[in-house]
Amino acid sequence: MNKVILAIAFLLSFSCIGKSSHCHAQNKLYDEQLLKKIKPIAPTSASLGRYGDHPVDLSTGQVPIEIPLYEIKSGDLSVPIKLKYHSGGIKLNQEASWVGLGWNLDFGGSVVRTVNGFPDEKENPEVPDVEKVLEEMDNDPKGDNCYDKYNLWNKAKDYQCSFRPDLFCYNIGNLSGSFFLINDSIVTTASVPIVGCINNNTQRLVSPDGNVYIFNASETTTISSSHVKMPPYTSTYYISSIISPNGTDTIRYNYQNSGEYSTRTGTTYQGVSIINRVIIRRAPEESEWKPQQEILPIPLTGNDIYVGSVKTVKPQYIFFRGGRITFNLSERKDLATVSGNITCKKLDNIVIERKTSNKYETVKKIEFHYSYFGETLTDSDAPQKLRLCLDSITEYGKGDDELYTLRLIASFDYYGKKQLPDKNAYSVDYWGYYNGNKSSDNIPKTDLQTYKYAKVGSADRTPNEALMKYGSIKSMTYPTKGKTEFLWEINRVGLANHLYESPYVRDNCI
């Protein structure tokens, strides 16, 4: 039976469109939602029977899209393996993960690090933290130590220090959240009590239920440019073992090198020089001399190129009581490989095996089928033009009759699959989504006028609702031939009787 599921769920601001008698109540509701602090949402496991259930989060407008693939059960421990899709839109310079653009594979846990300024553990020890800097400035109102403070800010500018700690976002079990490391102690940003420590590039987190998560597999990132002196740092920590509260059950992870890829991000800049001068000119209708101000545009001086490289790892085996899971990889074309290193890989299949005696027997095999967003004529320009696209997932394994069968888990369609331009194109809006406007730089077009008129920049960064959805998922088809269609539109926010557009993609309908 063919069935199409189309459930409409508008954002809060759209509730005001309709009868005017409803506007004030909806606006009040929106104000309350706006003032609430958005907390991390614990991911939930879905079942195959609930594929079509995709409720819209009313605070973010996003949709949880998850596809369960397998669940590891080892004594008191259980780990779901599932695909998750981020429904916040696809930015033009966004790279695809090892399972396709917009998708991520959850296989047990990870800690992703956002470096604020300079890596915490590699900061200049002579530089005080931000609290000490502020205290010193408060105690020196006359500025007697200006030279020392000038040197301090110069070190911050050169990335020898930072005035904010790095942010760590974790995903373990059914919990997600974030924390900071302050004096080697974890300070969480949510009410979920997570206990942990970091030592010799290993993180140890303990969840409220007592499970211990050890992270000592990692990815390393390096960033450099003419203005940045950033040493290599650990950007992602991957789970290496999960231990039950009583210590009787353990799930272990082995990792494989999945290549090193490079990224190039260019920025252009243009300034103006505001010159105050007295023009020796008498206004014809006035008797006094008038000082005038002149604005002189400074020509573009070129791009500042930020070059980054990421050394990646991916799971090879997961060992648990009574079996193991194997992850098989193959080469991909859409990531630029660092010279002399292994080509980056994508996930080809997952093999679930049962241990009998001293041998492993295949129970099922999950295959991932890909193509690419964009088009290219040569392999040399593939890293700039292509993005890995997940088309479908199939499963080969034993059915209820103990016979091996092949079945579809899900297939996907996307908006504008062949229309996305180069990753570094300037055709983006203020938030980085594709808008189709061609430009020679990414500086927003701005008109300045005092005594003389000047223009700065040439880019039209206006959002385009039709084009910003390019690359986002359009529909998902299930084994029953049922289908869920996803309709996306620009996010809008409203206060009182005004409605404002916020130019980035969020979901409108499912």
List the predicted regions and their residue ranges.
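Acidic, low-complexity segments
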Residues: 207-210, 244-250, 256-258, 320-323, ...
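Aromatic-rich beta-strand edge motifs centered on tyrosine
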Residues: 67, 81, 214-219, 230-233, ...
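Long, hydrophobic, well-ordered secondary-structure blocks that form the structural core
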Residues: 228-265, 270-274
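Long hydrophobic segments that form regular secondary structure
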Residues: 350-359, 368
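Beta-strand elements of repeat-based all-beta scaffolds
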Residues: 202-205, 240-242, 314-318, 348-351, ...
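Long, intrinsically disordered, low-complexity, charged/polar and glycine-rich segments
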Residues: 26-240, 244-247, 283-286, 292-309, ...
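Bacterial Sec-dependent N-terminal signal peptides
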Residues: 1-27
